[in-house]
């Protein structure tokens, strides 16, 4: 696995440019099992970053609806969804190697053939690798809320990002977000409502009930017992 999560960018004078990113690269230690999964299963399910569009049907070896998940953590929900929906192709992106290793291990144990994994900045992947109007769904579950006001600019859900997502969705494709931080949910709703070309699938024009397609996580179940809320938002590309 080529472990270049971000691609260096330079100005016309050769000086490195600094892009505001929604994540901090944490060099977590890999367990032996995670390292074994990276060594053994990355060649089968892993996808290296390239700064050019990829043919998604060739990538999966078949033509099927494509779901892109950004920031899958340890991959538990992603593997469950891929196992429950063999008629769909799933592409997961995560920047932290331990999560990639854990997901590869779980996917192998589940015998999945409809899942591909990337370890790179999702914004760069969307910008450069994903063809226009090629995705049936984009999933963004529990992204870092960046609680402090001075860090809000790091939140991944910003107008340029949701415009980028829209351009990669097919007409009728859906952008599904979930967060357990109410101020971030309100921020998501405000940003999404301000971008033309999206239709809010909520009957109340705000949040939707958790669809069965999104598995409950252990963290979420614990939060429910403690009375914590979770907000799901689903917006369809209409043009």
UniProtKB/Swiss-Prot annotation:
Residues 150-155 are annotated as: Interaction with RNA. Pathway: tRNA modification; N(7)-methylguanine-tRNA biosynthesis. GO terms for cellular component: tRNA methyltransferase complex. Its EC number is 2.1.1.33. It catalyses: guanosine(46) in tRNA + S-adenosyl-L-methionine = N(7)-methylguanosine(46) in tRNA + S-adenosyl-L-homocysteine. It comes from the Bacteria. The active site is at residue 144. GO terms for molecular function: tRNA (guanine(46)-N7)-methyltransferase activity. Keywords: Methyltransferase, S-adenosyl-L-methionine, Transferase, tRNA processing. The keyword tRNA processing applies. InterPro entries: SAM-dependent_MTases_sf, tRNA_(Gua-N-7)_MeTrfase_Trmb, tRNA_methyltr_TrmB_bact. Monomer. HAMAP family: tRNA_methyltr_TrmB. This is tRNA (guanine-N(7)-)-methyltransferase. It comes from Yersinia pseudotuberculosis serotype O:1b (strain IP 31758).
